[in-house]
Amino acid sequence: MSTVRLSRFDHGILCIEATEETSSTILDRLDQRGLGMALFGVGVETPIIVVDHRQGLTPDQLLAVEAHEVGHVLSGSTDEPTAELHGIAILRLAGHHAAAELLLNRGII
């Protein structure tokens, strides 16, 4: 079963931790999009991010994915570099410097 919780970086955003028991609709979209996705914008009352917990990621990698997806929501942008910059700032402000370095080093910005 998926865990649904508030994002550790913004309590106005729901976070779904996707596992093998998660709805196939969500898993299919994750398989197309990568390790996470964000649902936000016009008509979405509460933004939702989904983080793929099936991949055996480290805690820092999971934090990096969550922060990147929160970056999409907070910036209101689907642009990857914009979300990446916001994610790095979010992680640094929260003291997660190793996770921020993961985003810095992956080549999006």
Give the label of every model feature segment.
Residues 1-2, 109:
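Short intrinsically disordered terminal tails
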Residues 4-5, 68, 82, 90:
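Structured N-terminal alpha/beta-domain signature
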Residues 8-10, 14-20:
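Terminal helix-to-tail segments of small alpha-helical proteins
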Residues 17-59, 70-73:
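Active-site scaffold of zinc-dependent metalloenzymes
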Residues 56-61, 77-81:
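Soluble non-cytosolic domains of exported or imported proteins
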Residues 64-76, 84:
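Active-site recognition of the HExxH zinc-binding catalytic motif
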